[in-house]
Amino acid sequence: MGQSVLRAVFFLVLGLLGHSHGGFPNTISIGGLFMRNTVQEHSAFRFAVQLYNTNQNTTEKPFHLNYHVDHLDSSNSFSVTNAFCSQFSRGVYAIFGFYDQMSMNTLTSFCGALHTSFVTPSFPTDADVQFVIQMRPALKGAILSLLSYYKWEKFVYLYDTERGFSVLQAIMEAAVQNNWQVTARSVGNIKDVQEFRRIIEEMDRRQEKRYLIDCEVERINTILEQVVILGKHSRGYHYMLANLGFTDILLERVMHGGANITGFQIVNNENPMVQQFIQRWVRLDEREFPEAKNAPLKYTSALTHDAILVIAEAFRYLRRQRVDVSRRGSAGDCLANPAVPWSQGIDIERALKMVQVQGMTGNIQFDTYGRRTNYTIDVYEMKVSGSRKAGYWNEYERFVPFSDQQISNDSSSSENRTIVVTTILESPYVMYKKNHEQLEGNERYEGYCVDLAYEIAKHVRIKYKLSIVGDGKYGARDPETKIWNGMVGELVYGRADIAVAPLTITLVREEVIDFSKPFMSLGISIMIKKPQKSKPGVFSFLDPLAYEIWMCIVFAYIGVSVVLFLVSRFSPYEWHLEDNNEEPRDPQSPPDPPNEFGIFNSLWFSLGAFMQQGCDISPRSLSGRIVGGVWWFFTLIIISSYTANLAAFLTVERMVSPIESAEDLAKQTEIAYGTLDSGSTKEFFRRSKIAVYEKMWSYMKSAEPSVFTKTTADGVARVRKSKGKFAFLLESTMNEYIEQRKPCDTMKVGGNLDSKGYGVATPKGSALGNAVNLAVLKLNEQGLLDKLKNKWWYDKGECGSGGGDSKDKTSALSLSNVAGVFYILVGGLGLAMMVALIEFCYKSRAESKRMKLTKNTQNFKPAPATNTQNYATYREGYNVYGTESVKI
């Protein structure tokens, strides 16, 4: 009996504490259903309840809000059912939560059957369902208004399966009426980002430039990332983002490309309520409220906050109307068959639909089906200069553009801002000054491109800031990720406005950025270490004529001498007889020969004529003189030609290069060769279909260690240190410049492998492109480009025109040049001494024999001879017999 009394007293106290004001509860319990990716929304939900409960105004807070939260897995229908039933069994008055395509039907069915109101910021549905209060406004009307305003007649519609069917149906109906060409693609179930890329590439092949993207923020960011990677964010493209969180989307990488981006914004950041909420929001403890302090507020979080306002306002209305919504007893079983609805659920639903309140998302009202009505959506545009509010849309006025805030064009706006000019540290284009640490801004740099950027800025009338590219690369696209690096990446991803650098104009780059007319023409060339100058040989004086010619001269000399000898033998005019009337001769002197051109005299005559010297004898006969004349003519031409070439051969020390062309490189393996790791030169070999270059690319990509260098300086250093075992392939202009720099040990060999040019680059479709192009053309016509090249290449050269040696040194002869002449002189003198010694010995021996013969003759005196005999005359070893008898 006592226990029964105590139990009765306990329930009486609970009833007195829990109910007041005509049976209205002091605590309103609401449920919360959240998915995995709604972390910030969960924090906003709890913070909004906290803000309401800590409100000091009792008229605004006649009751206390309490919540019960469950997390559900939308892919598991049992999890969805269990989460809802868990909330219903707790006796909550209303449920706030999210749904997707898989869980929407389950949740709305339970709400309709059990008369439990479900307040959601998820995508709105066109179905006429009861007990569902949709916080998110429908975008269908705003999208159709903007399509008409922009006069889109051909576009691509990318939609999320969960939300896009109703909009797709409306667009297709409008397309039939307006003769639009619409390509619709569902992207809701795509998990691989490569599929987004394939869709964009396919649409680009169809010349599609306009896209309507109807997805959640995360998916839009993924699609735009692929758009940027593919370079489809340039001028001429227009993207309309059918999402209420335009400021939530990551647009920093897209905005500088030049494409027009239009979107919708439901949260007005200039609203005092929004500003006040954000001030408190950023001061929250991240551990208690995840994604609050260090993450921007999402529009779905703002809708979550407004949902708590709507729930609180609805129960205020019920309290003012003295509607008894108190729960008595158990809430019942949500799975009961038949379902047992809550009797007060209709009153709560009616109160929620009657709410009209100002929230963070503007005016909040609902129609009889729980859909937002009488709302205003801001329309934003994003261009190079930034984003701005382009107008607004509502159900009555439709789209209203702001005509008094027209966007200024990019070129005029660029005059009022500092243009970022990306470049690369590469001599002589951009270099640090010696005292750069004491300077600031653009004054720290010098070089060809520094001067060129200054001249272009002066003509275009812009302010600019030089920015050195972070990765030190020119720009190439990764074959796997398709992401651009280097200066091209700076332009593609909007981190720079202009690139003034030795950036080669190529097809793949032209697809994603714009180039001016070339400011410098060049080609790929080969750099090698300058070989050692070949020392002249001992007989280098023979080099002016080929050895074949020398052999022919020797044979000609012998032949002429023999012919002269024979001609002198046969011609009677070369013979002369002794005169009997001549005065008596010394019996000891030899007689004069009747023919002077014996074989030795013929050789001596030919040698004297060849050496341009005289001779004591000369031909008397006409035939002999003909031989001498043609020989003199022959020697005149030969000696003149020899003398003409002798100066060049003796004064120039030639260098023997191991290679002379790309073909020489390709067919050998001793000398390695490579290019920059990222740039047009590497791309040239990778894409080339010429057999020689294909062979070179096959070698380079498989060579170990790698033959690709990070910078040009690394490649040059490798050439200098490799002792002639590495050749570097680079632009001819850089090759020529380095050849003029100390230590003057590199050289360019062969011709250019291709023909191309350097250009000033701008983002695709940038308004600066045309102005920059005109500036480059003007500078070229004025001759300033040639003047700049001469200034930085040759006027500041350190090796001179001879590659490091002065003119005086190259024209002076060294002993090694003429050593052979001295050797011949010494050899000739030595030979003469030896021959003289032999002659002396021979003559001494002959004289000794003659003296002995004379003594013997004196001792023996024979009788005088009475007969006559022929007198024989000897001349230089040959017997010439006379025809007459001479008396002795």
From Swiss-Prot:
Chain positions with Phosphotyrosine modification: 871, 881
Extracellular side stretches: 23-546, 643-817
Subcellular location: Cell membrane; Postsynaptic cell membrane; Postsynaptic density membrane
Family annotation (SMART domains): Lig_chan-Glu_bd, PBPe
Any one GO CC term of the record: perikaryon
Membrane-spanning parts: 547-567, 622-642, 818-838
Disulphide-bridged cysteine pairs: 85-334, 744-799
Membrane topology: Multi-pass membrane protein
Biological process terms in GO annotation: long-term synaptic potentiation; modulation of chemical synaptic transmission; protein heterotetramerization; protein homotetramerization; regulation of receptor recycling; response to fungicide; response to lithium ion; synaptic transmission, glutamatergic
Matching InterPro entries: ANF_lig-bd_rcpt (IPR001828), Glu/Gly-bd (IPR019594), Iono_Glu_rcpt_met (IPR001508), Ionotropic_Glu_rcpt (IPR015683), Iontro_rcpt_C (IPR001320), Peripla_BP_I (IPR028082)
Binding site for L-glutamate: 502, 504, 509, 680-681, 731
Record's keyword terms, sorted: Cell membrane, Disulfide bond, Glycoprotein, Ion channel, Ion transport, Ligand-gated ion channel, Lipoprotein, Membrane, Palmitate, Phosphoprotein, Postsynaptic cell membrane, Receptor, Signal, Synapse, Transmembrane, Transmembrane helix, Transport
Entry's Gene Ontology molecular function annotations: AMPA glutamate receptor activity; amyloid-beta binding; glutamate-gated calcium ion channel activity; glutamate-gated receptor activity; ligand-gated monoatomic ion channel activity involved in regulation of presynaptic membrane potential; transmitter-gated monoatomic ion channel activity involved in regulation of postsynaptic membrane potential
Signal peptide limits: 1-22
Keyword Disulfide bond among UniProt keywords: yes
Intramembrane ranges, chain numbering: 597-612, 613-615
Subunit structure: Homotetramer or heterotetramer of pore-forming glutamate receptor subunits. Tetramers may be formed by the dimerization of dimers. Interacts with PICK1, GRIP1 and GRIP2. Found in a complex with GRIA1, GRIA2, GRIA4, CNIH2, CNIH3, CACNG2, CACNG3, CACNG4, CACNG5, CACNG7 and CACNG8. Interacts with CACNG5. Found in a complex with GRIA1, GRIA2, GRIA4, DLG4, CACNG8 and CNIH2.
Note, other: The postsynaptic actions of Glu are mediated by a variety of receptors that are named according to their selective agonists. This receptor binds AMPA (quisqualate) > glutamate > kainate.
Job of this protein: Ionotropic glutamate receptor that functions as a ligand-gated cation channel, gated by L-glutamate and glutamatergic agonists such as alpha-amino-3-hydroxy-5-methyl-4-isoxazolepropionic acid (AMPA), quisqualic acid, and kainic acid. L-glutamate acts as an excitatory neurotransmitter at many synapses in the central nervous system and plays an important role in fast excitatory synaptic transmission by inducing long-term potentiation.
Family that this chain belongs to: Belongs to the glutamate-gated ion channel (TC 1.A.10.1) family. GRIA3 subfamily.
Name listed for the protein in its UniProt record: Glutamate receptor 3
